[in-house]
């Protein structure tokens, strides 16, 4: 039952408008702690929904299909928006604007869109393989736990490799906590009824933090990757 729900648009607008707003502020802010915090905020907002959100949603008796639908929406939105916005904030010295947009798009597409396309291809063309893979569905919680462990490792690595100093770290902690709590809260408010409230909260709040760390480290101020590592911790508390 993969289809659009009423809360999808509201949740997506929170991510997109928040990202564009803070990206605009970052673009007109000079380098320093303030710009780092703005960059942390914008990537914590636009980061797509985590695949693990479906596992948590199912455990909480939410709507798994609605979470998967929102996962696809956020991946598509991030795939188109990020390559357009990042070059305005951190232009490449060796490439023009559109060439840099294309480079980022080619990096983002395999990470966010290709797995979804592969899943759809398997679902509609190779039913035997799909049935075999579906046998692992009851073990999805354990796969999520492994993913959580890896996210914690990435968080620790990001912190040690990009330690920003005490005050800057305190600011990044505050931003990551605030964006995490706000998105879970807004998601629950946007979703109407118990099931939609749970589902929208998980869809908007649970992030693909591995992608968040990768994005910050490679295309923004590298220390912003620490926000992704910290977000991985807060979203699972």
For each feature predicted by the language model, list its residue ranges.
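Alpha-helical transmembrane segments of multi-pass small-molecule/ion transporters
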Residues: 1-237
């Amino acid at each position: 039952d993969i289809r659009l729900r009423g809360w999808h648009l509201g949740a997506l607008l929170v991510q997109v408008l928040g990202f564009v707003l803070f990206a605009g502020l970052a673009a007109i802010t000079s380098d320093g702690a303030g710009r780092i915090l703005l960059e942390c905020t914008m990537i914590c907002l636009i980061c797509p929904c985590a695949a693990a959100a479906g596992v948590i949603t199912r455990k909480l008796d939410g709507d798994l299909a609605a979470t998967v639908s929102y996962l696809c929406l956020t991946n598509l939105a991030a795939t188109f928006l990020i390559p357009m916005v990042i070059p305005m904030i951190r232009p490449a010295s060796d490439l023009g604007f559109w060439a840099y947009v294309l480079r980022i798009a080619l990096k983002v597409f395999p990470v966010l869109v290709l797995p979804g396309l592969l899943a759809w291809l398997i679902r509609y063309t190779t039913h035997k393989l799909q049935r075999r893979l579906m046998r692992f569905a009851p073990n999805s919680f354990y796969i999520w736990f492994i993913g959580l462990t890896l996210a914690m490792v990435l968080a620790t690595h990001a912190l040690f490799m990009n330690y920003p100093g005490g005050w800057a770290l305190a600011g990044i902690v505050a931003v990551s906590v605030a964006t995490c709590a706000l998105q879970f809260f807004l998601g629950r408010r946007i979703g109407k009824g118990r099931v939609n409230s749970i589902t929208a909260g998980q869809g908007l709040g649970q992030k693909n933090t591995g992608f968040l760390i990768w994005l910050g480290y490679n295309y923004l101020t590298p220390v912003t990757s620490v926000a992704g590592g910290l977000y991985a911790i807060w979203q699972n508390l």
